[in-house]
């Protein structure tokens, strides 16, 4: 079945793309979530127009993300955490914690864009990758230090 994507769908395409998908995938997943509509002549013309507008928006968003990425890349941040004696943390530092630190420093990012390679459960310095857009992945350094009581 030919469909026109209304929103970006991971592993399928971007909004405005014309795609061939299985009937069941379209009826059971894409249509109920309003991620796509059935492609017909009228929808196809409208989709081409929408795709052009979407490309302009994506270009603007990519330029904005390049600016943010340039400002973030190589920066160092510090987080104070409680420890259970020695170097072990109570719990772990999560992407939510990193997002809140970045928010305090003027960068509002979704926690899903923050990639922590392995769980941070010890004191020390860690490199954290932030996936802003395709090809834009600044790396920050997070210093995990003991909170003084």
UniProtKB/Swiss-Prot annotation:
InterPro entries, A to Z: Ribosomal_bL9, Ribosomal_bL9/RNase_H1_N, Ribosomal_bL9_bac/chp, Ribosomal_bL9_C, Ribosomal_bL9_C_sf, Ribosomal_bL9_N, Ribosomal_bL9_N_sf
GO biological process: translation
Keyword Glycosyltransferase: no
Domain of life per record: Bacteria
GO molecular function, one term: structural constituent of ribosome
Keyword check for Transferase: no
Record's keyword terms, sorted: Ribonucleoprotein, Ribosomal protein, RNA-binding, rRNA-binding
A single GO cellular-component term on record: ribosome
One matching Pfam family: Ribosomal_L9_C
PANTHER family documented for this protein: 50S RIBOSOMAL PROTEIN L9
Function in brief: Binds to the 23S rRNA.
Family: Belongs to the bacterial ribosomal protein bL9 family.
Name this polypeptide is given: Large ribosomal subunit protein bL9
Gene name in the database record: rplI
């Amino acid at each position: 079945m030919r469909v026109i994507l209304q929103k970006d769908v991971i592993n399928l395409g971007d909004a405005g793309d014309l795609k061939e998908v299985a009937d069941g995938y379209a009826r059971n997943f894409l249509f109920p979530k309003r991620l796509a509509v059935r492609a017909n002549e009228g929808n196809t013309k409208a989709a081409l127009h929408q795709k052009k507008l979407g490309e302009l928006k994506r270009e603007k968003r990519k330029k904005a993300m390049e600016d943010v990425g340039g400002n973030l890349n190589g920066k160092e941040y510090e987080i104070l955490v409680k420890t259970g004696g020695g170097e072990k943390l109570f719990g772990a530092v999560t992407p939510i914690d990193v997002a809140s630190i970045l928010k305090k420093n003027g960068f509002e990012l979704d926690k899903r864009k923050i990639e922590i390679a392995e769980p941070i459960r010890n004191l020390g310095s860690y490199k954290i990758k932030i996936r802003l857009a395709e090809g834009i992945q600044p790396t920050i350094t997070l210093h995990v230090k003991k909170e003084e009581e």
